[in-house]
Design a protein with these regions (language model features):
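The feature marks the mature, well-folded catalytic cores of soluble enzymes
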Residues: 1-235
């Protein structure tokens, strides 16, 4: 694998692609959670995985190196201090008010190995995972029937959205909807700490914590000298 980011065309030869294989996060979609998680239908997991595997095979058969969010993010989280910072940022972007709940989630996630931690974050942290947690938050009590304390990421298989590779650099996008914003954090840590991406020469043009929303489908690399930016409902500038 050639290290770093090198993308100077939307239509040139594709050498490497970052994917997410649909997983347990799709099983979190129910009539009660669909709207909150931005779905209007419940996909069938086995069929989604079958279609994904066929797509990935076509890419591999044509010489494309396929890499996956879970493994690359886990590689970025090998150091304990990096994992601690990552978990704190994930909790912050989950809008959890109760300090007791924050600590319970932190303890649960930090007890896991990096790859398992990433899997659980993508699949969603359930109340049942934490056992009994004492909280004084009215908002938490109001949502006590909701199964998740940290929502799953069922939209992650739209891997183009959280970021855009531009030349030898990257945008880490501030996603428009709170339901998707944490997806960009996976990419941010991958870019900053995964040895296959965190090269000295790489540049970052936009960050998840910047003020305005941008999503990947709105950014097109036309040539080494030109980028087109769409101005649509999900992009605020």
């Amino acid at each position: 694998m050639k290290k770093g980011i090198h993308n100077y065309s939307e239509i040139g030869k594709l050498n490497r692609v970052l994917l997410h294989r649909p997983g347990r996060e799709l099983e979190a979609l129910t009539p009660a959670t669909m709207e909150r998680l931005l779905f209007d239908d419940v996909p069938y997991l086995k069929e989604a995985q079958k279609e994904h595997d066929q797509f990935a095979k076509v890419l591999k058969d044509n010489g494309v190196e396929v890499i996956y969010y879970e493994k690359e993010t886990a590689k970025a989280l090998k150091e304990t201090a990096v994992r601690e910072e990552f978990v704190s940022n994930m909790i912050e972007l989950s809008f959890i008010e109760s300090e007791g709940m924050k600590q319970a989630i932190r303890s649960f996630l930090m007890s896991l190995e990096p790859e398992k931690m990433v899997e659980e974050i993508i699949s969603g942290v359930r109340r049942d995972d934490l056992g009994e947690v004492k909280t004084g938050s009215l908002s938490d009590l109001a949502q006590s029937d909701y199964p998740f304390v940290m929502d799953p990421m069922p939209n992650l298989y739209f891997t183009r959205d959280p970021g855009a590779c531009i030349g030898d650099g990257i945008n880490i996008h501030h996603m428009h909807t709170p339901a998707r914003r944490r997806e960009s954090l996976l990419l941010k840590y991958m870019f900053e700490h995964d040895p296959d991406f965190a090269t000295e020469g790489n540049k970052q043009f936009y960050d998840i914590y910047d003020d305005y929303s941008v999503e990947g489908g709105d950014v097109l690399v036309l040539s080494k000298d030109m980028v087109a930016i769409g101005y649509l409902s999900l992009i605020h500038i």
